[in-house]
C-alpha cells in the first residue's frame, strides 16, 4: 500500500512539473529588452545574436555575427560599459506575437538616451526585430 502511495505521489509531482513547464511563457518583452540593452553595453555579441531575429543578424551564423561585431567594435573602449542603469519606461504588447518596449539608459558621462525595441514572438520566444534611438522629449520652459 505504501509503495502505491509513493508511486502515485511521484506521478502527481512529475505531472505537475510537466504542466508548469508547458504553461511557462518564458521571458517577457521587458525582460528581453533589458537583456538586449545590457548585452550591447557589455559587447556580449553572443547574447545579442540569441535575442535578435534573423533580420537583425543579417542572415549571419552566430559565429560570423560575433566575429563581425568584435571586429567592428575592436578598440572602441569608450562605447563599452557606459550604462549605469536601464529603465523600462513602457511596454506595449500589440498581440501575442508583437511588442514594443521603450527603454531609458542612464549613461556614466553623457545625458540619458532612450531606445525603442520592437519584438516579435518567433518559435515561442521574443526576438528583437528593430532597435531605434528615440529623440529626447522636448523640454518645457
Where would I find each of the regions flagged by the language model?
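Extracytoplasmic/periplasmic, Sec-exported soluble proteins
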Residues: 28, 37-40, 57-61, 107-111, ...
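Exposed beta-sheet edge and beta->alpha loop/turn motif
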Residues: 85-141
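Short solvent-exposed beta->alpha transition segments
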Residues: 25, 30-31, 35, 46-100, ...
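Short, low-complexity N-terminal intrinsically disordered segments enriched in polar/charged residues
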Residues: 1-42
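Short, charge-rich amphipathic segments
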Residues: 1-9, 46-56, 109-112, 135-139
Amino acid at each position: 500500500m505504501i509503495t502505491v502511495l509513493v508511486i502515485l505521489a511521484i506521478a502527481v509531482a512529475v505531472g505537475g512539473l510537466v504542466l508548469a513547464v508547458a504553461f511557462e511563457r518564458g521571458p517577457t518583452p521587458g525582460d528581453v529588452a533589458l537583456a538586449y540593452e545590457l548585452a550591447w553595453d557589455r559587447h556580449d555579441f553572443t547574447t545579442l545574436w540569441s535575442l535578435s531575429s534573423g533580420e537583425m543578424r543579417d542572415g549571419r551564423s552566430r559565429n560570423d555575427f560575433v566575429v563581425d561585431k568584435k571586429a567592428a567594435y575592436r578598440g572602441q573602449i569608450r562605447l563599452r560599459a557606459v550604462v549605469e542603469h536601464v529603465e523600462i519606461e513602457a511596454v506595449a504588447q500589440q498581440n501575442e506575437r508583437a511588442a514594443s518596449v521603450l527603454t531609458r539608459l542612464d549613461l556614466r558621462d553623457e545625458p540619458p538616451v532612450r531606445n525603442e525595441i520592437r519584438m516579435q514572438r518567433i518559435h515561442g520566444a521574443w526576438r528583437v526585430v528593430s532597435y531605434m534611438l528615440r529623440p529626447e522629449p522636448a523640454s518645457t520652459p
